Amino acid sequence: MSAIGTSRSPARLSKRNRDRIGSAIYHLIVVSSCFLMIYPILWMFASSLKGPSEIWTRLSSLIPKVPTFENYVNGWAGFGGITFDVFFKNSLFFATVATIGAVASSACVAYAFAKIRFVGRGFWFTVMLLTLMLPAQVLLIPQYIVFSKLNWINTFRPLLIPRFFGNAFFIFLMMQFIRGLPNELDEAAEIDGCSKIGIFFRIVLPLIKPALITAAIFSFYWTWEDFLTPLIYLNEPRLYTISLAIRSFSDPSSTTDWGAIFAMSSLSLVPVFVIFIAFQRYLVQGISTTGLKG
């Protein structure tokens, strides 16, 4: 018996050592990959605390010699008599309203495709999927012509109103989630006299909350970082979003205030981080459970 126990012990220890080595290598790779991904953000934040001469003379350093908040003060002062809080309010208004419109309209369309039978449902669903393959840049010129004739240029209307007509990606995401709901819930509600609208608001919406929050996070993030759409339709600085305002700190004809650019770019990430951390649980749940059925 002692010989058997002695022979097994080295094998058991050897396997344990292999597991430890494998775990150490795995965590080393994960930590290294995470550091490579967040390094640009760390460098940007560190540069926002450096003086103008130190930003480019100590590129690889993440620790400023003498930390200063002067870049934040200069950046928050804005330009043209408009402080940076105006641009924050514009971006917050744009992202919030656009997110509400995109999520609400997409949920309605997704419910119709998933639970309501109507003539041409398959055809229109195919058309919707085809729009995912169409680059947004292809529609820029015709959309600009239409919005120009409607006198919507230099207003938030071209940025907001199209969001209330749904988003193909969100529709598909919510549709797969709704398809996973038992049909018995709808049938029981119909027996109790509940209409399709009542079923949607009282039963479906509460059950697809993870999918709604997932779509809302994506919509807010995409809208918050959107640069091209505001660049095309907004001309007055008082209407600028954060992305346009940060671009304005860069002037090819004069000295670029890189410190202010890095400082305001760092501040612009705060709302995105807060929303992601607050709703991370719903985001993971919404992505992992979407498409399990249907």
Where are these predicted regions, by residue range?
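Short, Lys/Arg-rich, polar N-terminal cytosolic tail immediately upstream
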Residues: 1-18
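A structural signal for multi-pass alpha-helical bundles of membrane permease subunits
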Residues: 4-7, 22-294
